[in-house]
């Protein structure tokens, strides 16, 4: 599972906006794109990729990311490191977010859910679709895109989908 990044804004416990994380001024941005080496998996067949400068074309090779989460260090995760509180971000913070979610889902089910990508692509409504922003080369678009994949998690909906 490839993880992309967003910048999330919230108020009163509710998400007010979520866009592609691309903070060029401070050098941080989520990656994403289309592989030159890995074949298109069956669960990505029929998808398109949208470039930042416009234009959409069929996805012909493996596209990443599959999913995303808050990666902006300005809106990231409160952690304690060496007795100091700090906020971290980056897509390397999104991967453990997803790992933790899947671990919780596994704990709640009778057996492990296994490889969940096909189920997520079959149930894109289980994710919050991110449709604003770009990562430099690719633009967010409805459905899967090469910035945020299918979107960010709604934990209960993801659990129901897998």
Regions found by a protein language model. Name each.
Residues 1-162:
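Extracellular protease catalytic domains of secreted zymogens
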């Amino acid at each position: 599972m490839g993880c992309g990044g967003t910048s999330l804004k919230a108020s009163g416990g509710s998400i007010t906006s979520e866009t592609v994380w691309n903070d060029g001024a401070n050098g941080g941005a989520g990656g994403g794109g289309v592989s030159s080496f890995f074949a298109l998996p069956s669960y990505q067949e029929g998808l398109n990729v949208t470039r930042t400068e416009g234009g959409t074309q069929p996805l012909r090779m493996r596209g990443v990311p599959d999913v995303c989460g808050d990666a902006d260090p300005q809106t990231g995760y409160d952690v304690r490191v060496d007795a100091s509180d700090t906020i971290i971000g980056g897509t390397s913070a999104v991967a453990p977010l997803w790992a933790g979610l899947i671990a919780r889902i596994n704990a709640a089910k009778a057996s492990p859910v296994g490889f969940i990508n096909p189920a997520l692509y079959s149930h894109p409504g289980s994710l919050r679709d991110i449709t604003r922003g770009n990562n430099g080369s690719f633009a967010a678009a409805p459905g899967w895109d090469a910035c945020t994949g299918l979107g960010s998690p709604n934990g209960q909906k993801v659990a129901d989908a897998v």
